């Protein structure tokens, strides 16, 4: 008899470890529920793992949220940096980036809310780490992209 509920991460993961299964389960819960709040019992059920593993791998639920943010934002920063470094017209880079942003928010609709919560609710050192790893590199990439477009005569220079 087939189950009609969501698949357990442990049933769908090919070779993932428990840490990755917990991160993916948290991501699925946030996508399915359109929320950034989750309970450890729901996480445990979805991952098919003991909720004590959250403390083992992440220290607490906040640590899990930071690991999820690191996974998702790390990919974004890496991809944006690679795009800016490509040898192509700035307007094409912008077009590709906008498409990637749409794809990202379709795949991870919780990401912006999670990022804002982690910056707002984390200790100052953790908030600074998030800014240094993700927000500053994204801002720098945008500055470079716009500057390249202005130099190429494709974008107008404006005073924000």
PLM feature segments, named:
Residues 107-126:
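Amphipathic alpha-helical segments used for helix-helix packing
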Residues 21, 29-63, 67:
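Helix-turn-helix
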Residues 1-17, 28:
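N-terminal intrinsically disordered/low-complexity leader segments
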Residues 35-36, 151, 155:
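Conserved hydrophobic residue
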Residues 74-82, 107, 125-151:
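Amphipathic alpha-helical packing segments from all-alpha helical-bundle domains
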Residues 67, 81-111:
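Hydrophobic alpha-helical connector segments
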Residues 143, 156-160:
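Hydrophobic alpha-helical segments that form the core
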Residues 18-27, 43, 68-72, 76, ...:
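Generic hydrophobic, amphipathic alpha-helix propensity
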